[in-house]
């Protein structure tokens, strides 16, 4: 796969994968994947194996693997941007789509391709400029993405009767357009809400995706751009069962185009249980700083954590539905902080909590996973570089998540996945079993 054109590389991979799956299903189509219990049906289908999702797999102990590669491996192997050594999200997207670590040339082709596709249609700009300032940034993001479907190659081609075997090509084009435009939409929302509507400026085709994004947001610190490269890489995908990934997969299965599928995913990400956790962590840390005035002694922190738990709340940023060890997405953010902001008081507090919280949660005995997740750290890093607008953080998460769910959406259409339609049951029906 030496070609720098991602579509050409994909076109060569798809027939092989179609054949592999066809053979596998012929031989093992009837194999049972496990038992489904009554509790699973009432419990949000936790642990139920019912989806095929190719781009990443979550190992309870290892954490996320993107096409088989762990986060430390991705940090080592993916092409880097600046002198800071963080991987470029373009490289991760190439990996998610192809299963192959890209070359520097392939990544710079993607950067240029996205820069070329980035311009927003004027009606979307007008719409964003007309939103009231009290409309949540995630609502603005979702609405703008939905309105972008005026540009949908897939919807147009479907209306013209395109062959099923060509669906993936149009989904690819729309996914590439959408990823290219997302930083412009996100930056416009940021400037309108927090920078008096100032201009996001123009895309520079010589810069990478993250660098253009931080420029448009109005940040000039090269370290912040490095953080953005890391952030957009590690938040990109987390298996197929989480709310945003599952939503895009479900809506996409109705052959709704990538804009509609991704907007639906963003409405899921806007939910407090999915995308708001890093905001909640910062709120909790701020309260903790106010309360534990005794210069952050371990004992007073322990007391504060116990008070949180005893009042029936959870410690935000700790625990995960699947993970059973420290989230590697937490670890790489911790390493970034140790390298770039070791003296920051908020980072010191987060690092101190890392030593204390797991022990308290183990003593309490209720948590299956007492270790920190990705959200325990990201807010502190963003704040350090001056991005203090917590309401906006989920928008960054959303821009990143596009890489994973749209890579999968291309494959879902390439592999001809059908409309998703599980069977539901009533309580009476379950009791009658």
From Swiss-Prot:
GO terms for molecular function: citrate (Si)-synthase activity; citrate synthase activity; identical protein binding. Signal peptide: none annotated. It comes from the Eukaryota. Its EC number is 2.3.3.1. Oxaloacetate binds at residues 329, 401, 421. It is an enzyme of class 2 (transferase). Pathway: Carbohydrate metabolism; tricarboxylic acid cycle; isocitrate from oxaloacetate: step 1/2. Keywords: Mitochondrion, Transferase, Tricarboxylic acid cycle. SUPFAM superfamilies: Citrate synthase. GO terms for cellular component: mitochondrial matrix; mitochondrion. GO terms for biological process: carbohydrate metabolic process; citrate metabolic process; tricarboxylic acid cycle. It holds the Pfam family Citrate_synt. It is found in: Mitochondrion matrix. Gene3D superfamilies: Citrate Synthase, domain 1, Cytochrome P450-Terp, domain 2. It catalyses: oxaloacetate + acetyl-CoA + H2O = citrate + CoA + H(+). The active site is at residues 274, 320, 375. Key enzyme of the Krebs tricarboxylic acid cycle which catalyzes the synthesis of citrate from acetyl coenzyme A and oxaloacetate. Homodimer. Belongs to the citrate synthase family. Citrate synthase is found in nearly all cells capable of oxidative metabolism. This is Citrate synthase, mitochondrial. It comes from Gallus gallus (Chicken). The lineage of its organism: Eukaryota, Metazoa, Chordata, Craniata, Vertebrata.
């Amino acid at each position: 796969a030496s070609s720098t054109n991602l579509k050409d590389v994909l076109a060569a991979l798809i027939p092989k994968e179609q054949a592999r799956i066809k053979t596998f299903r012929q031989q093992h189509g009837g194999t049972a994947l496990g038992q489904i219990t009554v509790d699973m049906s009432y419990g949000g289908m936790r642990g139920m194996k019912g989806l095929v999702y190719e781009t990443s797999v979550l190992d309870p102990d290892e954490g996320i693997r993107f096409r088989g590669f762990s986060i430390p491996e991705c940090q080592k192997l993916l092409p880097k941007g600046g002198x800071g050594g963080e991987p470029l999200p373009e490289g991760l997207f190439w990996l998610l789509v192809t299963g192959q670590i890209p070359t520097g040339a392939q990544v710079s082709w993607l950067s240029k391709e996205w820069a070329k596709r980035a311009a927003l249609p004027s009606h979307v700009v007008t719409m964003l400029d007309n939103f009231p300032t009290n409309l949540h940034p995630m609502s603005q993001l979702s609405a703008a993405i939905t309105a972008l479907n005026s540009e949908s190659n897939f919807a147009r081609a479907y209306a013209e009767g395109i062959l099923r075997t060509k669906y993936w090509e149009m989904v690819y084009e729309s996914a590439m357009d959408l990823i290219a435009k997302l930083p412009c939409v996100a930056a416009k929302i940021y400037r309108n809400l927090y920078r008096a509507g100032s201009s996001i400026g123009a895309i520079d085709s010589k810069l990478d995706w993250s660098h253009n994004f931080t420029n448009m947001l109005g940040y000039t610190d090269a370290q912040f751009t490095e953080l953005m490269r890391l952030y957009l890489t590690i938040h990109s995908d987390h298996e197929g069962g989480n709310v945003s990934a599952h939503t895009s997969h479900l809506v996409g299965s109705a052959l709704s185009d990538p804009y509609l599928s991704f907007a639906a995913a963003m409405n899921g990400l806007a939910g407090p249980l999915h995308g708001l956790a890093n905001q909640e962590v910062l709120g909790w840390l701020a309260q903790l700083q106010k309360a534990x005035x005794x210069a952050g002694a371990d004992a007073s922190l322990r007391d504060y954590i116990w008070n949180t738990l005893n009042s029936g709340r959870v410690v935000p940023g700790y625990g995960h539905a699947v993970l059973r060890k420290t989230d590697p997405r937490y670890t790489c953010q911790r390493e970034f902080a140790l390298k770039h902001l070791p003296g920051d008081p908020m980072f010191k507090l987060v690092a101190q909590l890392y030593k204390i919280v797991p022990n308290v949660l183990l003593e309490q005995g209720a948590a299956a996973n007492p270790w920190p997740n990705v959200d325990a750290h990201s807010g502190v890093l963003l704040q350090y570089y001056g991005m203090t607008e917590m309401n906006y953080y989920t928008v960054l998460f959303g821009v990143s998540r596009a890489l994973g769910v749209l890579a999968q959406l291309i494959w879902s259409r390439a592999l001809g996945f059908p409309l998703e339609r599980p069977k539901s049951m009533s309580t009476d029906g379950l009791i009658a079993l």
